[in-house]
Amino acid sequence: MGASVQERDRTRLVLKQSIKNAVLSHQKVAEAINDDVVENISSIIEQIINALKKDGTIFWCGNGGSAAQANHLSAEMVGGMFKEKNEPLKSLCLNVDTSFITAWSNDNSFNSIFTRQIQSLSSKNDIVIMLSTSGNSENLILAADYCKQNNVTVVSFTGNDGGKLISLSDYNIHIKSDCTQRIQEMHILIGHIICAEVENYFK
């Protein structure tokens, strides 16, 4: 037999409370974005604008859900966020070339998939934006270290304690949370803000 009306009602109440808790958790993390974080976001926007004015490229990369967000935000820069037909901005996501990534990972190392592409594609006016909830992904650490040694600007979005990536970054957005979902929600929010403000500048 199916659940009784009372059981279904109880299940629905539990579900509603769970949804409310998730929203409240999101709000709490969002409200922790203080003036220091806003200052960092402003600096990153200025750096991206300066890079694009010098014909630089904005590269994005990440792993897992952060890879999806990197792809999303790169697409926002190329395609534009608004209805106006603005000029496309030079942006490329480094985790979408499946042929290269699978070949290089199979024959060499997954840890160097981003470093290799940055070696091939980057120049002094470029910026590499790395998204990582932990800040400890080895392929990002190695890529950031390469950038540091070769004067390529690194911007990182991190969470948890920031990991090793913070010290290798020229600019960092750190979300003080240990919940992966909340961290990624803030990353995409801030990424959208950055893309929108950069696009507005070049209207």
Question: Predicted segment positions?
Answer:
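Glycine-rich phosphate-binding loops that contact phosphosugars or nucleotide phosphates
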Residues: 66-203
